[in-house]
Swiss-Prot record:
Gene behind this protein: tuf2
Purpose of the protein: GTP hydrolase that promotes the GTP-dependent binding of aminoacyl-tRNA to the A-site of ribosomes during protein biosynthesis.
InterPro entries, sorted: EF-Tu_GTP-bd, EF-Tu_GTPase, EFTu-like_2, EFTU_2, G_TR_CS, P-loop_NTPase, Small_GTP-bd, T_Tr_GTP-bd_dom
Highest taxon in the source lineage: Bacteria
Taxonomic placement: Bacteria, Pseudomonadati, Pseudomonadota, Alphaproteobacteria, Hyphomicrobiales
Region (G1): 19-26
Key words, A-Z: Cytoplasm, Elongation factor, GTP-binding, Hydrolase, Magnesium, Metal-binding, Nucleotide-binding, Protein biosynthesis
Cellular component, GO, one term: cytosol
Residues that hold Mg(2+) according to the record: 26
Name of the protein: Elongation factor Tu 2
Reactions catalysed, as given in the entry: GTP + H2O = GDP + phosphate + H(+)
Length: 396
């Protein structure tokens, strides 16, 4: 039988498996591909193929991530699974594999463990919109009351980190039973039930093209007789010729009008998410715009200087710092296209941060930057990346 080709006519969604080490994240990933392969919605990918994930670099950080794809009757999914705990931390903070939702895997035999808690917290901090729980290894628990107890614990933990613990679907099953065909109810049927829950509960993400227009400024030119041209890659949305836009960040917000869009030296009537364009601005001087600002739909993004962030600090082996840092540390924060100096304030009770740590911290930038929650940044010292972070919340 010829391998079924994935049709891209279904809505696409990015998800991943998260949870404590050895609770069965990779086995579950393999089990999903096995069960969905029966209906032609996936190619079965065995555990050992997923487990030896290749390394990738994102924002100067090496991360091991395995990608599998599959589809249900409703959606096409790209699914990420990471071999080690540190890979999850780095992945979620750098957004190397953006997650529109996640499957939290908890072993029914162990209940929630330290990394279960940490992954839920990270999901909250980096803005993963929704979680679905798979209570794995249920074939190892004979007592139904014990299962109920574990489920209650998981719900309480989710609520503690501001997820709707009472409403989140929890599916009980066994990834191993699905892989070994040993128990249809806990194996095959549970996987189908899980995918039904993922389909229904994880909201369909808004496509970048449907979001408000934003383009980071990469370069600025002055073209005699035409005016000022700003180049960059459109991050999201659409800009049409004749539309009013704002220039945000670094200095006071200015209004201007896009009077032309050019791509590959051709004039277009609009530029959209993913396009590398030159945008001609009416009445804007060459010195009014600089790299590091953004062009955006008026009122859609504001400039900010103070925010709370979740960050991962590279180890010395990863090319990071060799020594810890303390409150009032002043590195550069690289947002989109530019470095801005900022001062780090560590949370009370945190004396210092060691290379390899992930931490919550407060940052005060010396100039405002167009910013919103979930925006990723790199932490740099003299052009060398020493960490990565994500804006968790904005203070001012």
């Amino acid at each position: 039988m010829a391998k079924a080709k994935f049709e891209r006519n279904k809505p696409h969604c990015n998800i991943g498996t998260i949870g404590h080490v050895d609770h069965g994240k990779t086995s579950l990933t393999a089990a999903i591909t096995k069960v969905l392969a029966e209906t032609g919605g996936a190619t079965f990918t065995a555990y050992d193929q997923i487990d030896k994930a290749p390394e990738e670099k994102a924002r100067g950080i090496t991360i091991s991530t395995a990608h599998v794809e599959y589809e249900t009757s409703n959606r096409h999914y790209a699914h990420v699974d990471c071999p080690g705990h540190a890979d999850y931390v780095k992945n979620m903070i750098t957004g190397a594999a953006q997650m529109d939702g996640a499957i939290l895997v908890v072993s029914a035999a162990d209940g929630p463990m330290p990394q279960t808690r940490e992954h839920i917290l990270l999901a909250r901090q980096v803005g993963v919109p929704a979680l679905v729980v798979f209570l794995n290894k249920c074939d190892m628990v004979d007592d139904p009351e014990l299962l109920e107890l574990v489920e209650m614990e998981v719900r309480e933990l989710l609520s503690k980190y501001d997820f709707p613990g009472d409403d989140i679907p929890i599916v009980k099953g066994s990834a191993l039973a699905a892989l070994e065909n040993s128990d249809a109810k806990l194996g095959h049927d549970a996987i189908l039930e899980l995918m039904k829950a993922v389909d229904a509960y994880i909201p369909q993400p808004e496509r970048p093209i449907d979001q408000p227009f934003l383009m980071p400024v990469e370069d600025v030119f002055s073209i005699s007789g035409r005016g000022t041209v700003v180049t960059g890659r459109v991050e999201r949305g659409i800009v049409k010729v004749g539309e009013e836009i704002e220039i945000v960040g670094i200095r006071d917000t200015q209004k201007t009008t896009c009077t032309g869009v050019e791509m590959f030296r051709k004039l277009l009537d609009q530029g959209q998410a993913g396009d590398n364009i030159g945008c001609l601005l009416r009445g804007t001087k060459r010195e009014d715009v600089e790299r590091g600002q953004v062009l955006c739909k008026p009122g859609s993004v504001k400039p900010h200087t103070k925010f709370k962030a979740e960050a991962y600090i590279l180890t010395k082996e990863e090319g990071g710092r060799h020594t810890p840092f303390f409150t009032n540390y002043r590195p550069q924060f690289y947002f989109r296209t530019t470095d801005v100096t900022g001062v780090v304030h560590l949370p009370e009770g945190t004396e210092m941060v060691m290379p390899g740590d992930n931490i919550a911290m407060e940052v005060h930038l010396i100039v405002p930057i167009a910013m919103e929650e979930k925006l990723r940044f790199a932490i740099r010292e003299g052009g060398r990346t020493v960490g990565a972070g994500v804006v968790a919340s904005i203070i001012e």
